[in-house]
Amino acid sequence: VKPVLVVGGGIAGIQASLDLADRGMKVHLVERMPSIGGVMAQLAHQCLHASASCAIAAREREFTTIDCCNCILTPKMIECFRHPNITIHTQSEISKFEGSVGDFDVKILKYPRSVDEKKCTGCGLCSDKCPVKNPSVFQAELETRKAIYIAFPQAVPQVATIDREICLWFTNSECRICEKICPMKAVDFEQKPKELKLNVSSVILATGFELYNPKEIGEYGYGRYKNVLTSLEFERLVCASGPTGGVLNRLSDGHIAKNIAFVQCVGSRTHTKGYPYCSASCCMYATKEAVLIREHEPSSHVSIFYIDLRTFGKGYQGFVDLAKSHWGVKYIRGRPGEIREDPLTKNLIIHYEDTEKGRVERLEAEVVVLCTAAIPHRDNKKLAQILGTRLDEFGFFDVIDPILNPVETNIKGIYVCGSCHGPRDIPESIAEAGAAAAKAAVDTIRLTVEVKS
């Protein structure tokens, strides 16, 4: 039985890999980063258990569950790593692709980690002694990491990697402290890129998305005002493993913020600066974050600026209703026109039109969180050229029919799931991963039957 190739190690790619592996099929999971996990690994919490009993919940004080993302994701990452039918290729990407369904020849280029994965125990001693610091992508650049580092505490594989762009040995031919200090002699500065050839029956694309950079919208002050954050930066601040240990300290002065405003649709639902589509998950994650703030600090005030509330999932509207009625979250219908900073207090003055009241108003907040758009990954164009798949007008992977064939691309045997073909929330990404895995399994089984007959 030929294996299946899964490209992308986020929650969609992990779920697709596990679904296939549990059917007894071999899977090669390719991830460009040092660890699998994707964006979900960066999230503090996720509203996953939105039940249908929200009407009863208000009466019985049983509310929609807001779960820790790592408690959900980490077991799946470990299961994926330990599954005998799954081979994980981190820091890797597709370099060449040809063939047809049931007989795809793929070349995988694996970039050097400069650390022997078989020897490294993940002790972190090398990172402790490394003298070079750089902004941590995992911590949304709110904290630094070393030139040799483990991606994050729950990283899979739990192996260090060297950033060659800032490592003193690769930039100035000096240092090598990590090599001297490593008790397992795992550091290997001589590692070279490796090429792996695979023959697979099907391919599943789960390459995910990127977040819009709100610096393009200058009137919101992102990058100029320290207390204007993106939603991902906010997630890291309120996460227990984040740079502040889960305390919402303002970046300007370290004070705990108790008056927070969220701005929806930053970079989405616009024809000027950003993209015209809805990013699907912003309404719910802003509500989730607002509830978390009120739960942790009952004296706080939280406002959410929105154009329209799009609560399409099961129990989602009930969750928003509870946020309003029980947690006291204030929803303001209107898109802010400008955000200015008070030079003395560093508070933020939001100028907006309340479209329900029909008048221009202003609101003062200690922190403003911009809910940024989910946009196509920068590598989509390159990968589409290699595979021969189509992209839509925005740069997401296209499907042949979003209604009847929602996970099938124009190339037979190549399937998509998750946010690589448009913004999705976590439950929808997981559901699509199952659909893509089922399609890929059919290809593999059909090929096996044809060969035997």
Predicted regions and their residues:
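Residues forming the flavin
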Residues: 1-453
